[in-house]
Structure formats: C-alpha cells, structure tokens
C-alpha cells in the first residue's frame, strides 16, 4: 500500500544500527539469553492460544506461532543493550523500560472492535491481552543488558471471564511468555516510587501513549514529576523500531507464510472476476480466501478500485460496479501470526487486457522488475525511488503521455506517480515509520516495491486512450546477501498468466 513521501531525518540511526551486531556478539558471550526457568503452562484456556490448548498452532516453548520464549528474551536483551549504548555517561543510573499494551476499543456501547495488541509491546513479550504493562528493569550494580522482565496483567475474574473469555492471569503470563515475574495490574503503582527516584532513568513513549487510561493513571504523573528533575523520561520508540527493522529467520518465515496465502487469495479473486462485478464482492472474496487459508485478519482495509477509481490511491469505499472492459486495482494483505503482507495487482475483470491497458501495464511491470533488481545491501529505498522516477519519466515519454524534456521528467513522474516506491514491512504495514528511507538496506530488512502510473479520466494532457487507467504492481521483498527474496512471488503479474487465470473454467 502506498505511503506518503515524507521521511524523518535521523542521521544517527545508521551508525547505531551498524554498531548493534558487534554489541550482540558480546552480549551473547556475557549474558544468558534464556527466559526465566520454564514453568508448566496451566492446563486451561488462557487469554491467547498456548501450546496446551492450541497444539495445532504452537509448539512447546513458543509464545506465538513460530516464535519461542528464547527469541522474545533475545529481543528484550537487545533492547537493553541499546539502552545501555544510548545512556553513555549515566553509568551509575538504574534503567527501567515501560511499554503499555493497547486497550480494548469500542465501536458502540458494549460492542468491541476486534482486539489488536500494540506491536511494540507484542514484539517484546508476545502477550496478547489488553490493559497490561511490560517493565524491563536493570539490576542495581549490574551492567546492562542484564535485567528483569515483569508483566503487570489483569487479574483472573470469573465474572468478567464469563462474558469476555478467559484471562491468563499472572501464572499463565509467566508460563507462556517466559518473563521473570508477573503481577496484577494494580500493583504497578507500588513500582512508581522507585521510578521517581533521581537515580532511575525511565524509558517510555509519553508523547504517543498506546493506552490512554494507563498513561493517565500511572505514567503521566510520573512523566510530569520526572520533567521537573534532571533525569527526564526518555523515549524508547526509536530503539524498538531499530530492532524491528531487521527481521530474524523466524520472522521471515512468518512473512513467507503471509505472502504465500495472500498470493493464493489473489489468484482465487482473479478467477472470480467476471464483468460486470461489484467491488464489494471482490473485497469479500479476497478476505474469505485469506481467512480460509489461516490469516487472522486483513492487514488493512483493501483497495478494490475499478476503472478510474484506481487513481484514488487509498480508495477503500469498494462499493461500485466494475464495468466490462475496466481493470480493477486490488491492494490487499493479511496478518498471519503477527506479521503482515502487502501486495497489489491490477487486472481486467473480463480477463483480457485492451491494447492501451496492456501498454500501460507492461510499462509499469518493466519499471517494477528494474526496481526489484536494486533491492540489495547498500542501496536504500530513496535510491530505488529515484530510479523509479527516472524510469517512469522515460516510459511516460515513450507512451506519448508526456513530451517533456529530460530536465522536467522527474516532475512529470511525480505527477503520474505521487507516492514513494515503497516502505518497510513487518508487524505493521507501514512498519517502523520513524526509520528513514535513506538507510542503506541490509540483509533481513523487508520492504515493498510498488511503482504505479495513474492517469485520471479528466487529464487532458494525456492521450485519450490512457485516460481513466491506473496501474500499480507491488511485491514484498526480503533483502538478502544475494538476490532478493520475493515473498509474493506466487502472485501472478505477467499478463499472460493473469489472462489465463481469469479465463480458467474450474
């Protein structure tokens, strides 16, 4: 899905990322990365799937599908290593990281939205219940990243559980996630006096709290008190994002699963496309095929844009009829076991590209192929974006859409493709948004590559045959030391393949 062009300028980020690998090799020699001693998971339903109740989803030792207690513990150690590096000059200071869960949001009285955990909280512990707090606390007299991990969670409550379902409680939280300690949520208040001390540096995202009530009850008074001292609260958001930017092999495997099942859903949706057809039907078909293959939810409201509506980049009304002879642009993805996909394909609903549609489609496809070859270590999304604009400018001229000089080709390219070439991808669709696109890519980063050309029907500068056409082609890409790994490789994008799928009979 396209994102805005603006990116924050964070010059120190690159150096910090480069320094992390060396720090981690040292960390692995000096500190245990094992979670707390394994405790038997209660033989009952918890507030989320466990290896006991959902053995078809989780293996023993896993917190979420495919991700073990050891991996979550390693993430926490990496974060505390970054805290140690950021806090140079505060060697005698204790450090406490506080991360809030999401609350339950309601669409109306007593009618909740499907709960989705805050992804920074989820990344660090895997706990999927609302109204919870994760605390990582350094040991006095011991060097970071040595620390204690604590969860503060809702109490077991038979009355509420009758209505809302089971809760993990403190015993379930420890046994499932592998944190060192767990307490009822209200006991967090007893930790606050220690956090107020001048000797304790608190790391917490007070500018954008994920849970307004917990922030108001506990963290806002603490933040205001610390603001009057020399030891102010420091943000932890960017540190977590720097960790999330580079995926582990286990994370990449989850994203491969999401990419594969989304690709299969696209194929079935293409096959179901007959003219005329309602955008709402294709929306429903795509969601069904994702969910039927194991997706938890859609990653975002999909764009299902027929005809000229494809020129509205984030069109999500999806309520119009697509006529015979028109194309549909479907930008969709799913979330599977905490990781998402984000794929775009454009195809004719009657199964046959017209000559102008084929010209424009092939132009975008050639641009996308060229951009994919650039997805290697050392380049950046900004570099790929510049190449995309150059190629679009040339294609616009070749198609007779513009007659501009080379000097003004970039301006024309931005007119007909007003979005960036891509963004980082992971637990979120627009993942790690504070990480600049100017960062050199490195193995383990996952990005999207999504060039497009959009020609509104009222554009009098373009040849009439192209007016009202919009094409975008988007793939999900893992940067490796060798050639890029295309997570969406199973999703057809060659014109012959698309036409063959749309014309199949069974």
UniProtKB/Swiss-Prot annotation:
Q: Name one GO biological process term.
A: protein processing
What is the species listed in this Swiss-Prot or TrEMBL entry? Mus musculus
Under PANTHER family, the record lists: XAA-PRO AMINOPEPTIDASE 3
Q: What does this protein do?
A: Catalyzes the removal of a penultimate prolyl residue from the N-termini of peptides, such as Leu-Pro-Ala. Also shows low activity towards peptides with Ala or Ser at the P1 position. Promotes TNFRSF1B-mediated phosphorylation of MAPK8/JNK1 and MAPK9/JNK2, suggesting a function as an adapter protein for TNFRSF1B; the effect is independent of XPNPEP3 peptidase activity. May inhibit apoptotic cell death induced via TNF-TNFRSF1B signaling.
Q: What is its EC number?
A: 3.4.11.9
Entry's cofactor comment: Binds 2 manganese ions per subunit.
- What's the protein here called? Xaa-Pro aminopeptidase 3
Q: Which residues bind Mn(2+) 1?
A: 342, 423, 450, 474
Q: Which reaction does it catalyse?
A: Release of any N-terminal amino acid, including proline, that is linked to proline, even from a dipeptide or tripeptide
Q: Which cofactor does it need?
A: Mn(2+)
Q: Does the keyword Transferase apply?
A: no
Q: What class of enzyme is it?
A: hydrolase
